[in-house]
């Protein structure tokens, strides 16, 4: 028993062929246990200044997406379309044309990492163009920290209850 229901393996910082090999290795292992694998093509940065993240940004190449999915056997694909991990220092500008082109090439669910701070209208548009899963880890951490700070003088279980409530509200 692997105590998990899915795996996300991000090898996107590696050169393309190494990314393919690493994801294929993970898929071969985890599929033996019926565990789906999410991969990333293109590289979603992690910078505190959005413009700096974009300077070395690697958008998902739609022409490689189909081959990548076929060669690796991944079950879902995280795309790099102008999104970054962490807190945005300015308004993110998503490349919806890239998303639309990738969606036409692959038959697996698409994932948007670094969605914390992306506006509701852009999220809705991304969903309409094929995004099936959205990661908002930074927003959830912020909600948890706000709840902890607001209830720091209360007993632990009361704080935990407020954190769960705040995270759930933020996620919805």
Q: Which residues are covered by each model-predicted region?
A:
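Alpha/beta enzyme core
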Residues: 1-106, 120, 124-136, 142-149
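Glycine-rich beta-to-alpha transition loops that act as phosphate-gripper elements at the mouths
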Residues: 109-120
